[in-house]
Amino acid sequence: MNHKKLILSLSLLLPTAVFILYIIPKFNMETVDFLPFLNAIINGTVFFILIFAFMAIKKGKRELHKKLIYAALSLSILFLLSYVFHHATHDSVAFAGAGLVKYLYYFVLITHIILAAIIVPMVLITFSRASKEEFKTHKSIARLTLPLWLYVSLTGVIVYLMISPYYPY
């Protein structure tokens, strides 16, 4: 399968799988109640790894940049697996805040969700360009991918911090 077909397939499959998780019945597994916290840790770690990867490439340290991006991708895959497993085993938690904080929460959540769906193909395309040593186009799309990936990673942590007081566990 070529890169374009794989990127398109994953870009359609992942958001569809996440959507399905919200409509299927859940099975209870209290032993994985720690997953939202773990997901926030993973998101925060990805955020900092991406910053270090950016700093590395700016200093001309291509190998370090490559290793850091592989780490960010690996952690993002781990996050996705953990996220899917958590939402397959737990119902969504309603935000119970009021006033301005409620609007802020939903703004952050909605932008996070939309950009999380958008960032998947962008990350895959950016990675694909680098793996094929098409560094000019890689750099061009990375200028858009990096800030969006940073935003999604950071807002993942913020969403967790805002919703965590309402978890029943």
Where are these regions (language model features)?
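Alpha-helical membrane insertion/targeting regions
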Residues: 1-169
